[in-house]
Regions:
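Short, well-ordered coil/turn residues at beta-beta hairpins
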Residues: 120-121, 144
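Glycine-rich phosphate/adenylate-binding loop
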Residues: 2, 109-113, 126, 136, ...
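N-terminal charged helix/coil linker that caps or initiates catalytic domains
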Residues: 1-26
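Glycine-rich phosphate-binding loop and adjoining beta1-alpha1-beta2 segment
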Residues: 46, 51-89
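Conserved SAM/SAH-binding loop
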Residues: 98-106
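Hydrophobic/small residue at the entry helix of a nucleotide-binding pocket
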Residues: 33-34
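Conserved N-terminal Rossmann-fold NAD(P)-binding element of oxidoreductases
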Residues: 27-29, 52
Length: 251
């Protein structure tokens, strides 16, 4: 029978589509990367999701995040993403968590229900804990390395964390995971040398914050605010989604 997923089924086959429909993917971080992960996975037929993020859509997100429009500024990202996913597939099951993943609340998430975990968060502390928790529960995980301050979308590739180079975030992750005796982690990273952002206080969030009312204003507390473009984090998200689909279908 012809369905909205028929074109995908022509490539993957019915057995693979059934696997996707019966899978639950947890996406941690619904931003420039995570938003496109969700977009591609729901369009691919994944049947259930957990979305984790405590941020609200900010005006500065409009340059790259698929959930960001003038109408969604000020709304929780997980709410906007869920609404969008239901418009694509009314039968999708989406659970939202309006919080930031930390070691302190890691046990509150049902990792035993996840078939795959996507790490699209920004902080090293959260990323490390997410990797440790996922691997302890034998849940496959893929982690996004640095997408900020990059301009060459074609430079991103899939590799084990031990094979990465150039990426500053991957370097820190390698060191921290080695301390914890973690030997393998699938990541998406780039060997492009990061571009140094222009130091212009007139366009600095630190001095001219335009976060919506009620937001956490985290940007004003960050030591460095990376530059970003529409065509880089989106590609990272789509690469990650492709890996998730292939791995779920191969189970």
């Amino acid at each position: 029978m012809l369905t909205q997923f028929s074109r995908t089924e022509l490539l993957l086959g019915k057995e693979a589509m059934d696997k996707l429909k019966n899978s639950r993917v947890a996406v941690f971080g619904i931003g420039g990367v995570g938003g496109y992960v969700c977009e591609a996975l729901v369009r691919s037929g994944v049947g259930a999701f957990d979305l984790i993020d405590d941020d609200k859509v900010c005006l500065t997100n409009l340059n790259r995040q698929i959930i960001a429009t003038r109408k969604t500024v000020g709304k929780y990202k997980v709410d906007v993403m869920k609404e969008r996913m239901l418009e694509i597939n009314p039968d999708v099951n989406v659970r939202i968590h309006k919080c930031f993943f930390l070691p302190e609340n890691a046990d509150e998430f049902p990792f035993d229900e996840y078939d795959y975990v996507v790490d699209a968060v920004d902080t090293v502390t959260a990323k490390i804990e997410l990797v440790m928790k996922s691997q302890a529960m034998n849940v496959p995980i893929i982690s996004s390395m640095g997408a900020g301050n990059k301009l060459d979308a074609s430079a991103f590739k899939v590799a084990d964390i031990d094979k990465t180079q150039m990426c500053p975030l991957a370097k820190v992750m390698r060191r921290e995971l080695k301390k914890r005796h973690v030997k393998k982690l699938k990541v998406v990273y780039s060997e492009e040398k990061p571009t140094r952002p222009i130091e212009d206080m007139a366009i600095s969030c630190r001095n001219h914050c335009i976060c919506p009312p009620g937001a956490e204003h985290k940007c004003t507390e960050r030591r460095d605010i990376p530059g970003s473009v529409a065509f880089v984090p989106s590609v990272v998200g789509l690469i990650i989604a492709g890996e998730v689909v292939k791995d779920l279908c191969a189970k």
